């Protein structure tokens, strides 16, 4: 129960990092935190295969989007816009976590009782659907992400000319 509370707080922190700042560097950090913690939450619920496949898809897609956003950014020295909001939120999260560890917050309703009984279900329930009839769609999706990454890397390679970078 305490693990899920910590994961949900980390998910909330990642969402605030994503929303508060306009710099793509911190936005990519927020997306990575949100995707990792979201996949850990799915893993804690018992779906290990779905968690792994979503993690690979999220990180592959985010690599392309982050490369494109940093190619177009004009920010040489990114700063956090709202430092006070992040500090107050971190203090609030620490208070909630310590209250939860002290036993003052009771939220056990039996939904997460599987965490105490043995952890993760290792069944491959989603493998048949992902690799059955839709294998060609997965291959084309991976090739599309790879092609987009190559295009973005070609755009960022020409940093000395064009309107993409300010030097």
From Swiss-Prot:
This is NADH-ubiquinone oxidoreductase chain 6. It is a multi-pass membrane protein. The gene is MT-ND6. Keywords: Electron transport, Membrane, Mitochondrion, NAD, Respiratory chain, Translocase, Transmembrane, Transmembrane helix, Transport, Ubiquinone. InterPro entries: ComplexI_Subunit6, NADH_UbQ/plastoQ_OxRdtase_su6. Its EC number is 7.1.1.2. Core subunit of the mitochondrial membrane respiratory chain NADH dehydrogenase (Complex I) that is believed to belong to the minimal assembly required for catalysis. Complex I functions in the transfer of electrons from NADH to the respiratory chain. The immediate electron acceptor for the enzyme is believed to be ubiquinone. PANTHER family: NADH UBIQUINONE OXIDOREDUCTASE SUBUNIT ND6, NADH-UBIQUINONE OXIDOREDUCTASE CHAIN 6.
